[in-house]
């Protein structure tokens, strides 16, 4: 069975793992109420999207 010829250094191991991280969601403030919300989605607090009242109809 094959084994690694050299030990993997801390730096090389960490460089390989730089992409194994959680992505931060794109948060923006609602222009209507100022509440934080996910980008390109309806605001949960006031129910508006792109300046229009979507939920409370």
From Swiss-Prot:
InterPro entries: Ribosomal_bL32 (IPR002677), Ribosomal_bL32_bact (IPR044957), Ribosomal_zn-bd (IPR011332)
Record bears the keyword NAD: no
MF terms in GO: structural constituent of ribosome
Recorded superkingdom: Bacteria
Cellular component per GO, a single term: large ribosomal subunit
Keywords: Ribonucleoprotein, Ribosomal protein
Stretches of the chain forming a coiled coil according to its record: none
Keyword Transcription attributed: no
GO biological process: translation
Protein family membership: Belongs to the bacterial ribosomal protein bL32 family.
Protein name from the UniProt record: Large ribosomal subunit protein bL32
Encoding gene, per UniProt annotation: rpmF
